Amino acid sequence: MTNNVIIRQLGIQAYQLVLVAMQRFTERRKANTIDEIWLVQHPPVFTQGNASESEYLLLIPGDIPVVQSDRGGKITYHGPGQQVMYVMLDLRRRNLLVRDLITILEKTVITTLYKFAITTAYSKKDAPGVYVGDDKICSIGLRIRKGCSLHGLALNIAMDLSPFLLINPCGEVGLRMTQLSRLSPVVYNTTDVVKVLLEVFLSLLGGTNTGAIKTWHYNDYLNNSES
């Protein structure tokens, strides 16, 4: 039970729906609830973490909604072509500290990028995420509730980066964002990357997939039963 993980493919889902579903899944967890990993892309949205402040949003975002989130960190942008991986893990059961999970997520992205010939990716001690040169390619934000994690990472693969110009990403003034398609001469999409991302994460975590990747239905998280 300890190492089992259910993988769910959400496709493209509104951030607000997934946020509520994550919260309800975590609230209803029991000691024997199997951990889950959710793979998703979001329609364009800015999300503000618990540490976000109004000055991090530089310009009026137009048609892109701004959503308050309960994750750690500051403001970021999600959009199609960015692979998001949410990790709902019982950290106590896995004997992991929050810093341990952040390190695993960072190593997951660095190793994944290396497999796609991006060999210079690195992490920073005081700024969770993954960087290439001076630019950021992956953002990480977590929340811990009852010893369990929710939220996760967002890896830029082949997306429109221009909305990042409307904010100070992660609260860092002048921070530029980059993506795999800009750094690699080979064209990759999220399908190419997600298989490697998942394999690397499970290897570092010591997790065992419980079987085929499962579908996800929002209504499952509205009833009173455990998903």
Curated annotation (Swiss-Prot):
It catalyses: octanoyl-[ACP] + L-lysyl-[protein] = N(6)-octanoyl-L-lysyl-[protein] + holo-[ACP] + H(+). GO terms for biological process: protein modification process. Its EC number is 2.3.1.181. One of its GO terms (molecular function) is lipoyl(octanoyl) transferase activity. PROSITE patterns: BPL_LPL_CATALYTIC (PS51733), LIPB (PS01313). Pfam families: LplA-B_cat. Pathway: Protein modification; protein lipoylation via endogenous pathway; protein N(6)-(lipoyl)lysine from octanoyl-[acyl-carrier-protein]: step 1/2. InterPro entries: aa-tRNA-synth_II/BPL/LPL, BPL_LPL_catalytic, Octanoyltransferase, Octanoyltransferase_CS. Residues 31-209 form the BPL/LPL catalytic domain. Keywords: Acyltransferase, Cytoplasm, Transferase. HAMAP family: LipB. In the reaction, the free carboxyl group of octanoic acid is attached via an amide linkage to the epsilon-amino group of a specific lysine residue of lipoyl domains of lipoate-dependent enzymes. This is Octanoyltransferase. The gene is lipB.
